[in-house]
Amino acid sequence: MRSYLDFEKPVAELEAKIDELRTLNAQEDTPAIGEELTKLEAKAQKALGDLYASLTPWQKTQVARHPQRPHFVDFVQGFIDDFTPLSGDRKFGDDAAIIGGFGWFEGQSICVIGQEKGADTESRIKHNFGLARPEGYRKAVRLMELADRFGVPVLSLVDTAGAFPGVDAEERGQAEAIARGTDACLSLGVPNIAVILGEGGSGGAIAIAACNTVLMLENAIYTVASPEASASILWRDATRAQDAAMSMKITAQDLLKFGIIDKIVPEPLGGAHRDSSTTIVAVKEAVVEALGALRDLSPSEVRRVRREKFLGMGRKL
């Protein structure tokens, strides 16, 4: 069953009428019903197109968090063959919020790392809603080092509200683990590609996203802190999240303009949650293109290009 966001209410009402007419048409199949159904479908498509053509940053935040948006496991199942996950950080334990392993992508070995939020109550609890603890980031570092040793490119699929802020995570060195992850990304001699799938939240995202190429889905967000957290800090009022989202420049369109990301991956009309398979294909094609552009670079060139990319951020604003 499709889940609608608050601002999608006009479209929801139209699609409810369409469903009613489809049921009636299946029973009676009269020309009048068929004609009305065609008109309503066209009206709903136009309404959806107009709505998504002018989304505010706060509305994009809601789309990025949509419960039916495709997650890490969907993309891995969609275009990674023979994926073999590895567990544990060899220091404390395993963290299910970050999944990582090796597989085949278009006939080439690849290391895939990313946050998994979960799709239902049980899986969300298992994966801690994609909020990783230090052992998750240390596991990611271990995988990146393995990939570097064997000359395998790294693909990071980012979807997290941030690193887990619990006391246990702080006790085990959350900040250090995030810093080590960021350093590992920047130090790799193999190409690395990051895709911001939904939320790219703070250090929890950057720890696996400091890559040669950063791709971002059209309605994803990438931010130093959630709009709610920023509103609480700036105005001591979390209800001003909409104002914070507008001020923070968190959308793919703004971040492309500022040179923070390299390419926007288009989503189907109405967002990735309406057509996961098309979204997965679009991400796959974008990753193929990005890897192709880096494939012939030597390890030193890969590091140099990545270094220049990040050092150049902010110089041309």
Curated annotation (Swiss-Prot):
GO terms for molecular function: acetyl-CoA carboxylase activity; ATP binding; carboxyl- or carbamoyltransferase activity. Keywords: ATP-binding, Cytoplasm, Fatty acid biosynthesis, Fatty acid metabolism, Lipid biosynthesis, Lipid metabolism, Nucleotide-binding, Transferase. Pathway: Lipid metabolism; malonyl-CoA biosynthesis; malonyl-CoA from acetyl-CoA: step 1/1. The keyword Nucleotide-binding applies. GO terms for biological process: fatty acid biosynthetic process; malonyl-CoA biosynthetic process. It holds the Pfam family ACCA. Its EC number is 2.1.3.15. Acetyl-CoA carboxylase is a heterohexamer composed of biotin carboxyl carrier protein (AccB), biotin carboxylase (AccC) and two subunits each of ACCase subunit alpha (AccA) and ACCase subunit beta (AccD). PANTHER family: ACETYL-COENZYME A CARBOXYLASE CARBOXYL TRANSFERASE SUBUNIT ALPHA (PTHR42853), ACETYL-COENZYME A CARBOXYLASE CARBOXYL TRANSFERASE SUBUNIT ALPHA, CHLOROPLASTIC (PTHR42853:SF3). Component of the acetyl coenzyme A carboxylase (ACC) complex. First, biotin carboxylase catalyzes the carboxylation of biotin on its carrier protein (BCCP) and then the CO(2) group is transferred by the carboxyltransferase to acetyl-CoA to form malonyl-CoA. Belongs to the AccA family. This is Acetyl-coenzyme A carboxylase carboxyl transferase subunit alpha. The lineage of its organism: Bacteria, Pseudomonadati, Pseudomonadota, Alphaproteobacteria, Hyphomicrobiales.
